[in-house]
A protein has these predicted regions:
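Interaction interfaces in information-processing and related assembly proteins
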Residues: 2-247
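Cys/His-clustered metal-coordination modules, chiefly Zn-binding fingers
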Residues: 212-305
Length: 305
């Protein structure tokens, strides 16, 4: 996409991630919008509105980060865990365009909160862990930072600043209906090779300050507007630049990897006595998938067949 407005843009970019670069500013980014996929993931749970909203934001953030992976089998996991927080655990992951996520929380304590609930009110003291698993390269990277700031986006920026030392801007938004969520990630490219100053060590670099100033003009309703094509959104933000290179959109889908064989393989790791202790009054070991809420009832005969 050049700096002129695209003549023919897609009607909407629901359930897609679009990567882009601004070569003259040494910046790269991703913009994501979720629609039906978000509904599909949330429909597996009966979450109250505040919990559904924070999970929606986390799913968008996971898509923004996961779509950076170049390895098809690579996996990105976002995990927020707290000490005595209303939200005990939030987990989302991305692999090959597929998203899933869930939240464990205290319903009674949530109901006691006032209507305005910031990040600290929901999580209290906790941490954000972001893990990149790259099986082809046999590598695993994990960064852990405190859950700080008033939003999940602020916590993500803290992760990039502290763990990767890459100047980054993250914005996340959920529309009033809760059925559409969007987000944008913009970073200053760490271009330096050995012997050169790496751009990401200069947090006050004028190129980054310029890009960040433009990106900060984005509105929440632009990110979550299903009628606004993502390329048009990028043009609105950066049309004064010499060039914006938009990449082919990456389709996103709900993907849960639970199945009978996987559950069976997990249970088979337990000894026979432990397996018998798990059997319920109906004669089954029932295993719930927290991601998609499916229940797998397995008898001992099926387990040991």
């Amino acid at each position: 996409m050049a700096s002129s407005q695209p003549e023919t843009a897609p009607v909407a970019n629901l359930d897609e991630a679009v990567g882009f670069t601004i070569p003259s500013r040494h910046a790269r980014g991703r913009v994501v919008r979720l629609g039906p996929v978000l509904d599909e993931i949330l429909s597996a749970h009966d979450y109250p509105a505040p919990i559904a909203r924070i999970l929606s934001e986390a799913l968008v953030m996971t898509a923004l980060l996961g779509s950076l992976l170049k390895e098809p089998e690579g996996q990105l996991t976002v995990q927020a865990q707290t000490e005595a927080g209303i939200i005990d655990l939030l987990v989302c992951d991305y692999r090959d365009g597929e998203l899933r996520g869930y939240v464990r929380f205290d319903t009674e304590r949530l109901n006691e909160l006032p209507s305005h609930r910031d990040l600290f009110a929901l999580f209290g003291k906790g941490y954000l862990a972001i893990t990149f698993d790259l099986p082809m390269a046999d590598e695993r990277y994990q960064g852990i930072v405190p859950l700080e700031g008033g939003s999940l986006a602020a916590a993500a920026e803290s992760y990039f600043s502290q763990s990767e030392q890459v100047p980054s801007l993250v914005r996340l938004a959920v529309d009033d209906t809760g059925h559409v969520a969007g987000g944008i990630l913009i970073q200053h490219l760490p271009e330096g090779e050995e012997g050169r100053e790496r751009l990401h060590t200069r947090l006050d670099h004028p190129e980054w300050e310029h890009v960040r100033t433009l990106a900060e003009t984005i509105k929440a309703n632009e990110l979550s507007n299903r009628e606004l094509p993502l390329e048009t959104l990028l043009w609105r933000l950066f049309h004064e630049e010499e060039e914006i290179r938009a990449q082919t959109a990456v389709p996103l889908a709900k993907g849960c990897r639970c199945n009978f064989e996987y559950v069976r393989s997990v249970l088979s790791r337990f000894g026979e006595e432990e397996q018998r202790d798990m059997v319920d009054s109906d004669g089954f070991i029932s295993v719930d998938c927290e991601f998609c809420s499916r229940v797998f009832p397995i008898s001992l005969s099926d387990l040991n067949a």
